Regions:
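Secretory targeting and sorting signals
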Residues: 1-42
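A generic alpha-helix preference that emphasizes hydrophobic side chains
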Residues: 22-26, 36, 72, 119, ...
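Extended non-catalytic accessory segments flanking core domains
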Residues: 46-323, 327-353, 434-437, 450-487, ...
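Intrinsically disordered, low-complexity polar segments enriched in Ser/Thr/Pro and acidic
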Residues: 7-10, 38-48, 220-221, 227-229, ...
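Divalent cation-coordinating acidic motifs and surrounding scaffolds
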Residues: 293-647
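Secondary-structure junction/capping motif
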Residues: 14-16, 49-55, 375-379, 580-581
């Protein structure tokens, strides 16, 4: 991974992951040849009386010597980067709560080499990635004023084995807290228990050499990181059917170990790929997570994970799918369009209707006032046709410029991609409302042309059941719940004459305002969830209005809800509407649509009204993206096939 250097003070990266691959003469610093030893390798020199690294680290999240100057702290250099190095005491104490490793900040390129025995003088500090006010933990450092090399070529301290056969991290608890405990700052006290709390377990190893034996990947390579489980996953939490690990309510799987390419290149890996033997590195902290900065490139063993395909819908089955296109525009490389076409044609077997999110305007991230998406969609439809798929059509509502959040100028929106050769038709109603509206809910005045980007779709009672005043139409676009984010889109379709109301959309994503799981505030606050709760309320209100106009109305809500099936916003939507979230009917170990940091989770959903849920149906998550390097971060599409007669 190519890392960019960011400086928080002179020569200072905010965290190691941004200081990491500067090269000298084409050779990464971490793998530059060690300087020749001045003499035969010898054990580290005896330490002078004074402070040791475990005194600097202390048993807690903040050094007891923070702000103090320490002199001639001994250690062996274990890794080197552009403006500092890690060192470890070869003579540890017996307290597993105090780390024996530390990062030494030198401001400029250090002159030491791996396996040098050194004495360091400097000021102890706590460096917080993201700035002093961020929710990240601090990393204990020595801001060096003097570094004396005592000997070259000394043995490295042995690494701590993580997992079975070594020091085992807690497998469910990041930080134990009383029920309903308010959020507090762990750096200001509250106990330190590495045996039971994963946050403390990894803190007690900060800066030390660690080893992972026979690692298995539980997430794909992404941004230079690979989440793995030691010992092939022995003793870990619930595994997915395809080799990942399942995120559960109250269990974020802290036994995961994240390998980082900060010091040496790492192989591209998919879920289930393995690293046989040992993988060594230095445990570091940056931007909300502990990572192992690997010091020698391991060899990958292919796990053979296939990309899934679903079965084709049969005659009489309506197939409805979800697809997150993650910022698609005409600027997107042709290979991406081809891959998406493969998802539709091969993976999903060309469903009748796809609720789509993430479509950008015709100029992508160019902030030029463009909001139309016809060129973006035309390229996608062409790619589907070239892949052997049927002719698709498209409906969406262009947003007002820069009103829907996302990348600046991109104007992402939701939409409906559909085929009409199997009995599905889209009901276009751009103005005026349905012609058969009942007298107590008359159509809009003839000739009225509301701006669909800001006009809320209404449910209209007709002689044949509930219909929409606009199709497609946006749900409560003026509601504060949708401020600076995409608006949900409702559409009216017919299947062999049977009317169905479909809602597509993406709920507010997790943001930088959410506190990290491995941060200083426990339990972490997630303000983005508050937005999703408000959005769930808005969508639920719309669905209730549809069902109030026709108790047996056919309703489908589908898309990227950015929430897990057990989370409060999704639970609120189902409880307030009577909809069934189909993900809850799928096997727990095979319902995930995303893999985040190695945790498999369900963020994309299809929900059915009772009238459809009673019909014979089959739901499938088609794992084609989230578990693979190259498509990491993209969602797996989902599809439901409903045996549905017409009317």
């Amino acid at each position: 991974m190519a890392h960019t250097s960011e400086t928080g003070r002179t020569g200072r990266p905010p965290a190691v992951r941004s200081l990491i691959v500067t090269v000298v003469l084409g050779v990464p610093l971490a793998v530059m040849p060690v300087r020749p030893a001045l003499a035969a390798p010898a054990p580290a020199a005896p330490a002078p009386a004074g402070r040791r690294i475990h005194d600097v680290q202390g048993a807690g999240h903040v050094s007891p010597l923070n702000g103090a100057t320490v002199a001639q702290v001994p250690g062996v250099v274990t890794a080197v980067t552009v403006n500092g190095f890690w060192m470890q005491d070869p003579h540890p104490d017996r307290d597993v709560a105090t780390s024996e490793g530390v990062y030494v900040f030198t401001r400029s390129r250090p002159t030491v080499a791996v396996r040098d025995s050194v004495h360091v003088t400097g000021k102890v500090s706590e460096f917080r990635p993201g700035g002093a006010k961020s929710a990240n933990l601090g990393r204990t450092e020595i801001d060096a004023t003097a570094t004396a090399v005592v000997a070259h070529g000394v043995p490295l301290p042995p690494p701590v084995v993580l997992g079975p056969g070594g020091r085992r991290p807690p497998t469910s608890t990041i930080k134990r807290l009383p029920p309903f405990a308010p959020t507090r700052d762990v750096e200001k006290g509250g106990g330190f228990d590495p045996a039971h709390d994963a946050l403390d377990f990894y803190e007690a190893l900060e800066g030390m050499r660690v080893r992972v034996v026979n690692a298995v990947a539980v997430g794909p390579s992404a941004y230079g990181e690979i989440p793995v489980l030691p010992a092939g996953g022995a003793g870990a939490g619930i595994r997915t059917a395809r080799g990942g690990i399942l995120l559960r309510d109250g269990d974020a799987n802290p036994e995961r170990v994240v390998l980082d390419d900060a010091l040496v290149p790492l192989p591209a890996m998919n879920v289930g790929d393995r690293l046989p033997g040992t993988t060594d590195g230095v445990l570091d902290y940056g931007y909300g997570e502990f990572t192992v900065l690997v010091t020698a490139t391991p060899k990958r063993a292919d796990g053979g994970l296939p990309r899934q395909v679903t079965r084709a819908q049969r005659p009489g089955e309506l197939a409805v799918a979800t697809a997150d296109l993650s910022g698609l525009s005409p600027d997107t490389p042709a290979e991406r369009f081809e891959a998406l076409a493969g998802d539709v044609v091969d993976g999903l077997k060309a469903p009748d209707l796809i609720t789509v999110t993430g479509v950008q305007d015709n100029t992508g991230t160019k902030d030029d006032g463009t909001v139309a998406d016809d060129q973006t969609v035309a390229e996608l439809i062409s790619a589907i046709s070239a892949a052997g798929g049927p002719a698709y059509d498209w409906r969406s509502i262009p947003p007002r410029d820069k009103a829907d959040g996302g990348e600046k100028g991109a104007n992402e929106r939701a939409g409906f991609l559909f085929r009409t050769d199997r009995g599905l038709a889209f009901v276009d109603r751009p103005e005026g409302g349905p012609s058969d509206a009942l007298a107590d809910d008359p159509p809009a005045a003839a000739g009225s042309r509301p701006d669909p980007a800001v006009t809320s779709v209404r449910v209209v009672r007709t002689r044949t059941g509930p219909a929409l005043s606009l199709s497609p139409g946006r749900i409560t676009p003026g509601d504060a719940a949708w401020g600076a984010t995409g608006k949900p889109l409702a559409g009216e379709v017919t299947w062999h004459g049977r009317r169905i109301i479909v809602v597509a959309g993406r709920w507010f994503p997790k943001t930088g305002d959410d506190q990290p799981a491995f941060g200083r505030f426990q339990p972490p606050l997630r303000p983005s969830e508050w937005r999703r709760q408000a959005q769930a309320k808005a969508v639920a209100g719309f669905v209730r209005s549809v069902r109030a106009a026709g108790r047996d109305a056919d309703v489908i809500v589908a898309g990227d809800l950015n929430e897990r099936e057990y989370a409060a916003p999704v639970q609120a939507l189902t409880k307030q509407t009577g909809l069934t979230d189909l993900s809850t009917r799928a096997p727990k170990n095979d319902r995930h649509t995303a893999v985040s940091g190695g945790n498999a989770e369900t963020l994309d959903h299809i929900l059915l009204s009772p009238s459809l849920n009673r019909r014979k149906h089959e739901y499938d998550v088609v794992h084609r993206n989230s578990e693979f390097a190259g498509t990491a971060g993209r969602r797996d599409p989902t599809v439901v096939r409903i045996a549905l007669p017409g009317r």
